């Protein structure tokens, strides 16, 4: 349980991976506790990776799949998901992540779109030659940190250093 790592001493790891828990935490206290524990077990100067599911690509996917009306009771008037456990995933916008992180003594190194649009092109990737795929990956790495492009990703990765 990422919210309580009391079986781990403080300041012991050079790298901490929080890859998954934030997808399934629905209240601010739980989110804060998970980040707090990741920061606590990380050494000063260590790196923490925290992954999030993107709100707006999910909204787009619901439109494309003609399913948005099925979830209107879980979406506010600004199309921000009101996530709850029975829906499985908590969805975030960058401002949500920034709000969660605001109270921690950390320095953001990178905020990236982890998969960008690859979720939409599963079959196309299977059909690519190695040369095409390598070129796509070069493109992916060129755009994955661009602030105007991160919103295209289904998953975001916040990489920060403990001060």
Regions found by a protein language model. Name each.
Residues 3-16:
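A short acidic, Gly/Pro-enriched loop at the edge of an enzyme's catalytic core
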Residues 4, 23-24, 55:
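Active-site micro-motifs of SAM-dependent methyltransferase domains
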Residues 14-29:
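A short SAM/SAH-binding and catalytic strip from SAM-dependent methyltransferases
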Residues 32-47:
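A short glycine-rich, Lys/Arg-flanked "PGG" loop and its adjoining helix->strand segment in the class I
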Residues 47-75:
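Conserved class I S-adenosyl-L-methionine
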Residues 69-89:
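C-terminal alpha-helical "lid/dimerization" subdomain adjacent to the S-adenosyl-L-methionine
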Residues 87-105, 109-111:
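Short alpha-helix
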Residues 110-163:
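A C-terminal cap/extension of S-adenosyl-L-methionine-dependent methyltransferases
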């Amino acid at each position: 349980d990422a919210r309580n790592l009391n079986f781990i001493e403080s300041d012991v790891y050079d790298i901490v991976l929080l890859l998954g828990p934030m997808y399934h935490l629905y209240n601010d206290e739980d989110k804060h506790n998970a980040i707090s524990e990741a920061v606590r077990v990380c050494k000063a100067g260590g790196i923490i990776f925290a992954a999030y599911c993107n709100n707006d690509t999910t909204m787009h996917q619901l439109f494309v799949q003609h399913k948005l009306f099925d979830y209107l009771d879980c979406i506010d008037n600004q199309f921000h998901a009101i996530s709850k456990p029975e829906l499985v995933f908590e969805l975030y916008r960058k401002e949500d992540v920034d709000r969660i992180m605001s109270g921690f003594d950390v320095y953001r190194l990178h905020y990236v779109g982890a998969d960008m649009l690859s979720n939409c092109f599963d079959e196309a990737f299977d059909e690519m030659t190695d040369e095409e795929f390598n070129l796509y990956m070069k493109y992916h790495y060129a755009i994955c940190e661009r602030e105007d492009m991160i919103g295209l990703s289904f998953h975001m990765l916040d990489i920060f250093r403990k001060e």
